[in-house]
Amino acid sequence: MSVVCVAWSSHVGALMSAASRPGMPSVRVLSSRMLEEPDGVERCLETMRSATALFVFRTTDALWDQLDEGIRLIGKTVPVVCVSYDPAAWALSSVPVETAQTAYRYLTYGGAENLGNLFRFLDALP
């Protein structure tokens, strides 16, 4: 099992690079573009269900609406951090808002060190 991160395709390369660095917890990075594939929503949900912690950088694209209920259900058993440019999407998080804010800062500041810290932070969530 691992931390699962679903993010915009523009972030995937940097996230995957940070996840492959020595000393990182097990991380699966998924591009939100997979949601556009015929079975993408179900494959994404299946991977998210295997997470020990879930980080979602949600867009306002209507495809995400199909994931919302699944994210809520996953949040009943594992920590879910959902961030977005739309503050309403943060309500999908199952963690305190301060936890989501910290994770969002790591992503926003970017760079290998901050993204590595994001993964370690997510991996340490209870």
Task: Indicate residue ranges for each PLM-predicted region.
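An N-terminal assembly and electron-transfer interface module characteristic of large anaerobic redox
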Residues: 1-126
